[in-house]
């Protein structure tokens, strides 16, 4: 596959630290669907280049959703593969535990092709028709407080898939509620970004976006014992989540619980900024803690604000997630008549 690099787009200073991008040091593009709305953070500039047709795909870093969230807000496809499948050499780390090199594309097929290039492997998406697929919708955290646009698009998508013969179960997946407690001190991102940036931050803090610097500094208070406790807690958490996921071909969730919010109210309001930032990361970041894989694809109706559907699974379930995503994309494109009710 011949690849041409056409340029670099604006991105957040340090990967996923803001899921909502606003930087005084650079111009900020709005969402392509709504110029006054945020384009998201990190790989938001790359998402805009793909959405406008300036590039076929955009490469980026997904540490807590920085590929999937911009894709969702721009009506694109973002695939976060299992971390170990793509090399991380040569890039500045945010979190060596969570960072994943991956990409934004316009279709699931393109995501499959580009993943093959990045991972130097031949993906084998499991080709299975909707009828017979066993899918699950986690009820803990993932569907809380959805805005009207996201709720409408998500429920319609589930109805379309059921009409196509997919079995969709609601499951609790209760361990999702524990993540905020596990990461109360800042988690892997704070500890590992502080480790890498501390000398530079102490010497050249003026070069950092103030909101980014604030989040990196959370790692300053974490001890070695805190970090080791987090490593063990994560391993235990992963085992419990995987046990509840067993038996399903993939899980389904909204990628982001809201459509692109307006940018203006966030520029000078730190409290509002961090509240929206946390909300936008909420559904995507658990996949990174799981060491899992996930693909966001558009599921909104034509003419509506973009909404992303996240198809996700455990580590090394990449081909299954890609295969299910291909089927869902085709079903939505075909406009299968939705079933009545959920």
Give the residues covered by each predicted segment.
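Short glycine/serine-rich loop/turn segments
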Residues: 1, 7, 13-22, 27-101, ...
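Short connector loops at secondary-structure junctions
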Residues: 167-185, 216-217
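Short helix-loop capping/hinge segments that flank enzyme active sites or metal/cofactor-binding pockets
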Residues: 129-134, 187-238, 296-306
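Structural helix-boundary/capping segments
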Residues: 52-144, 155-164, 222, 228, ...
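Small-aliphatic-rich amphipathic alpha-helix that forms the alpha element of a beta-alpha
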Residues: 273-297
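Acyltransferase
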Residues: 149-172, 198-203, 227-248, 277
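Short, surface-exposed loop/helix-turn segments at secondary-structure junctions
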Residues: 183, 228-229, 260-281
